[in-house]
Amino acid sequence: MSLGGGGQQQLQQLSQEIQAIEEEVEELEADVASLRQEQTEIEEAKEALDVLETGATVQVPLGGDAYVRAEVKDMDEVVVSLGGGYAAEQDSDAAASVLDEKKATIDGRIDDVQAEIADLSEEAEQLEQQAQQAQQQMMQQQMQAQQQPQDGEQ
């Protein structure tokens, strides 16, 4: 049972478009997961600012899942990344404000990416409906073509 050549091309094109959208959605979902990880790290940093005191013992990551214990010498000044490879020493309140701003920016980016995912998902759904309609039309045409010779024989 073969489908008409033009209809097959249309179905193949729709299928490719749907697949491309699904791949883009997967990439965007990975972006959201990465942004959520950043959110978690910011929340943990803010919590540490609230909890840590001068003289506290902490574990400092060295990389490769290796840590060293260290004593906090001064919680009055905190070094905060400003982005672009720059950092600044600020008091705890100012550092917390910088972290709040970063989190708000990430929240906005997550909202934007999720909106894009929703738009793409809707587009994919519309394309899937078009593909189903095209396939149904082709099957109806094929059934009609098969029935015509039989009608003439009677």
From Swiss-Prot:
Molecular function terms, GO-annotated: unfolded protein binding
Q: Which gene encodes it?
A: pfdA
Functional summary from the UniProt entry: Molecular chaperone capable of stabilizing a range of proteins. Seems to fulfill an ATP-independent, HSP70-like function in archaeal de novo protein folding.
Which PANTHER family does this one have?
PREFOLDIN SUBUNIT 5
Low complexity bias: start-end ranges:
127-154
InterPro entries recorded: PFD_alpha_archaea, Prefoldin, Prefoldin_subunit_alpha
Pfam (any one): Prefoldin
Any one of the GO CC terms = prefoldin complex
Which CDD domains does this chain map to?
Answer: Prefoldin_alpha
Q: Which family does it belong to?
A: Belongs to the prefoldin subunit alpha family.
What name does the UniProt record give this protein?
Answer: Prefoldin subunit alpha
Localisation: Cytoplasm
NCBIfam families reported for this sequence: prefoldin subunit alpha
Q: Which GO terms describe its biological process?
A: protein folding
- Name the UniProt key words of this record, in alphabetical order: Chaperone, Cytoplasm
Subunit info?
Answer: Heterohexamer of two alpha and four beta subunits.
Which species does this protein come from? Halobacterium salinarum (strain ATCC 700922 / JCM 11081 / NRC-1)
- The UniProt annotation puts the region (Disordered) at 123-154
